[in-house]
């Protein structure tokens, strides 16, 4: 029921009450008149007529009120009908509004979804364009960097060649000065000898004259005695000349014989010599593996270089990467590590550390096997196991570009051939020649020359004094006293002095890098040192408990200053100190 219905109902009720009240008043007035007046009284009759008229008027008013009430009821019913229709229309309007609102909301959501998808598409296009632009810029930068690195490398090679030519020219001039000095000394000695001979001839002429003067006054017996003495002196002189000729002939024959023995030994050995390289090539199953090796933002390649100390060069060469390091052991460990990672397919920092440990163990086994093969090739059976381990270290050690283990095998063969020609103890001399460079496996751990260190090691592990003396005397640090020591020297010189066996430029380069690592490794708190980029960068790994951030910067400055003071090198050397803290917890 709305407000209009309520007002209409109240009006009807009020009108009903008024009509009923008027009827009651009329009835009561009629009854009063009936009780107080007589029927034949004119006043009574007039009053009665007036009351009847009033009653009739009241009845007509009541009827009119009833009709009004009926009209009001009809109007109220019509109003209720209209209100119901209005409510139905309002309900339909609300339903229509709700339907329109739902449609608008669905349309808005669809528009929002389309706008969102379009925004995502445009964002993806922008990201793709940015990534392609970054890749193009990175490729251009890589090409520029590679060209600059190649140019720097070419300049370094030219500088090394120029330095080598300058060194050779200085050595030739020094050799020429020595030859001129020797020639001048020989001329002066010859002039002195000629002057002395002239004086001796003049003195002999004077003695002969005095002798003739004296003989002229001697008797026959005295002259005979003088003649006998002269003949004896002449015989002694001829005998001395004969002895001198025999000695000269023996010396000439001995030199010829020795030369024949050495040449025959070298010809019979004639081992091949391959120049040691500082770069290894690893072939990949496909170019997509290069991206996995690099890792996200270069994480894998940085971890690989910091753990192995080997430069990993990834360029446009199809299905291949380069590993560069001056240390052959490090380079071989890095090559095996990367090969195992590529075969396994799992390449991440933790896996790199695990595979690196396995590769180090495998390289140690390869060294042990190489030493055993060399012993079998030379023919040495009884030897201390510790010496076998030291010999295995020499598989990846070079001397002026010549592999030390191959040099020992070659020296042993040459010494054995020369000993057989001279009918000497072949096994002992081969053992001396094979062990003469054993000290090179410990020169980075023990102070002293490799000859003295090797002799001490051989003596400690039960080698004979002949072998020990040959080892310590093969560089004349101790004067050679036995034929074994002399033949060890000769075989060492024959193996190392052959054309193409050794290269001093590579050895100088390797020594410079080793000295750089020694300088940095001698500082307090340093754990590992790697010379990278052909010596142009030094990475120093420090222990975080011993070196803080301030000490790390001071350490880098000290290393750079000491390198500047002690070494001569082209260009500049960057010293990078890496301080890394690792905390590991196990969730159980």
From Swiss-Prot:
Principal location: membrane
Domain KH: 278-359
PROSITE patterns on file: HD (PS51831), KH_TYPE_1 (PS50084)
EC number: 3.1.-.-
GO molecular function, one term: RNA binding
UniProtKB keywords: Cell membrane, Endonuclease, Hydrolase, Membrane, Nuclease, RNA-binding, Transmembrane, Transmembrane helix
Bilayer-spanning residue ranges: 7-27
Function, in words: Endoribonuclease that initiates mRNA decay.
Family classification: Belongs to the RNase Y family.
Protein name: Ribonuclease Y
